Amino acid sequence: MSDYGLPPGLNDIAALAERALHEIPLGQFPGIRELTIAVEDSPDDEMLAELGLSSPWELTGLYKGIPLDQRGIADWGQEPDQVVLFREPILLEWIETGDSLPDLVRTVLIHEIAHHFGFTDEQIEALEQKTRDGAARH
């Protein structure tokens, strides 16, 4: 991270995401290392329209792919699933909440990975809370 008052860049967010990915227990998410992670500045208009969102600030991350619990035989062997993190909305949330940036990136990453595994919103919230509790103990 920059110590000179500059906002964290794409590479900074990517490094935080990679670190967070390697902190996630593999037993909880088998096959997690097969996901690719990308960091972009913000979602594009097409993405927002597909999701029914009007503002790019509403979307901090996106899972692109077919959740494991919805895959059929024809879906295997397709392009790897991807989690995209959006730097600018993440930074805005970071500023607004005062949360630690590594914790926020980890939360967004875990939320999107949980979509890959077909978790419900309730399961995702429980997982995020468990992860926050675990991070607080370290």
Which ranges hold each PLM region?
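Active-site rim/adjacent substrate-binding subdomains
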Residues: 1-104, 116, 120-126, 132-136
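Catalytic glutamate of the conserved HExxH
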Residues: 108, 112-116
